[in-house]
Amino acid sequence: MRALLIYPLFPPTFWSYEKILELVGRKVLLPPLGLITVAGILPQEWEFKLVDRNVRNVTEAEWDWAEVVIISGMIVQRDDMVENIKEAKAHGKLVAVGGPFATSVPDEVQNAGADFLILDEGEITLPLFVEALERGETAGIIRAQEKPDVTTTPIPRYDLLELDAYDSMSVQFSRGCPFQCEFCDIIVLYGRKPRTKEPAQLLRELDYLYELGWRRSVFMVDDNFIGNKRNVKLLLKELKVWQEEHQYPFRFNTEASVDLADDQELMDLMVECYFDAVFLGIETPDEESLEFTKKFQNTRNSLADSVDKIIKAGLRPMAGFIIGFDGEKQGAGDRIVRFAEQTAIPTTTFAMLQALPNTALWHRLKRENRLLDESKGNINQTTLMNFIPTRPLEDIANEYVEAFWELYDPHGYLDRNYRCFLKLGAPKCKTAFKLPNLVDLKALAIVIWRQGVKRDTRFRFWHHAFGILRHNPAVFEHYITLCAHNEHFLQYREIVRQEIGEQLRDYLSRQQQDKVEETVLSPTAIAAETEKVLAS
């Protein structure tokens, strides 16, 4: 069987990092780990070709070659996924679709023309798909009620990737999260009991990446890397030895809950394994909103103190913030900005709350008749809320745009970055010395020219750079990399302001039109007009 695997386009997002990737001559931040895992699960006598549409388009030769087309993606990739399903059908191909989007909204995928829907987790459903093909079936919906044992998951087919196109590779140690955040779809898709691989299993994946010549960053894509602290510590103890033996070829980052700060041993192990950054779902500094959305793990200790501990341990924080929670008070955007400034978090992803399909939030809003469009929850930073909030949407949208704009003001960003790296714990591992390549030197020269010469940030840029060299030189390379990141954020805040502004104007226009129509067609208005006619 000749299988063509297609990964749909992402729209421009906070994480697309176009301007940063341009600097270093790469096209995409991360590879499609789900699809290359699918390729590892399917029969290895099959032939595979993979096209990441974020890297390049599918060629006619590839369409002609394929016997079956397999597409997977997330909700944010909806539009291009639907287009590729239609394109595959136009080429007369059998189309199978899976992944988070198809699992969450199967009707949309089926309506687009998919033949097979391979839903839930592939370790169980992909073998059932293969059996269906062997029986001669040409369509079907394949689901699984149980969660698979991920210790049986094969090594992803990293060899199918165009490795030079990616800035970082992805590996996964665990699935699931023990918490119960109302808005989160991870616990819906993967459950609340974290399932982990064996340490030796993950090390084999790293061995394979190493054999393929990979020597850059690796992102642990676990939704909560520390969901099972016991097992993750077992992994880190073995990973530390592996990294030492291989002279630390990989720099790691990941996602974790804020209670990471409560476990010094765990943070130390991560830093000793060459983890240097962690994404934290902080969401909001408003404790009432955290409790309402059931993010109780963020209310047990001071969030500011937790972030400070994580920084001092040697892990740069990236933080996720959300605006628009039920019961939220005016000024939430300002409070988020103040918190980011207070805690010196350089990179803060920020979005208006969305009700993602089948989450607890989605079900509650559906019961309350507050969903504006049941199927179109999104996770992009340029999308208005898809439900009726408890305070005016225009207030939330305006606060959001203003806060996003302020967070990525070039002066404020450099200051926040500087304060973070002044106290960032130094790396605890000795990496092999290597000369910078020409691409990296060119990128550095561009950043210095833009931020240290051309723009009015020049004084701050040089003051802060020399300050880091003087007070914390071990983190200087990491610091300069984060300075470069604002090349993307400067552009993206313009996109946020423009697209949210356009959507808000359309929304307010529709609201006004609805009011006019309601007034014109209301029984009171009709009765009044009738009386006028009779009186005349």
UniProtKB/Swiss-Prot annotation:
Keyword S-adenosyl-L-methionine: yes
InterPro entries: Cobalamin-bd, DUF4070, Elp3/MiaA/NifB-like_rSAM, HpnP-like, rSAM, rSAM_horseshoe, Tetrapyrrole_Bchl_Biosynth_MTs
UniProt cofactor(s): [4Fe-4S] cluster
Pfam families for this protein: B12-binding, DUF4070, Radical_SAM
EC number(s) reported in the record: 2.1.1.-
CDD domains xref list: radical_SAM_B12_BD (cd02068)
Matches recorded under PANTHER family: ANAEROBIC MAGNESIUM-PROTOPORPHYRIN IX MONOMETHYL ESTER CYCLASE-RELATED (PTHR43409), HYPOTHETICAL METHYLTRANSFERASE (PTHR43409:SF3)
Enzymatic class: transferase
Protein name, UniProt field: Uncharacterized methyltransferase sll1242
Keywords from the UniProt entry: 4Fe-4S, Iron, Iron-sulfur, Metal-binding, Methyltransferase, S-adenosyl-L-methionine, Transferase
Binding residues annotated for [4Fe-4S] cluster, in chain numbering: 177, 181, 184
GO BP annotations listed: methylation
Ranges for domain Radical SAM core: 163-394
Manner of cofactor binding, per the entry note: Binds 1 [4Fe-4S] cluster. The cluster is coordinated with 3 cysteines and an exchangeable S-adenosyl-L-methionine.
A Gene Ontology molecular function term of the record: metal ion binding
Signal peptide: none
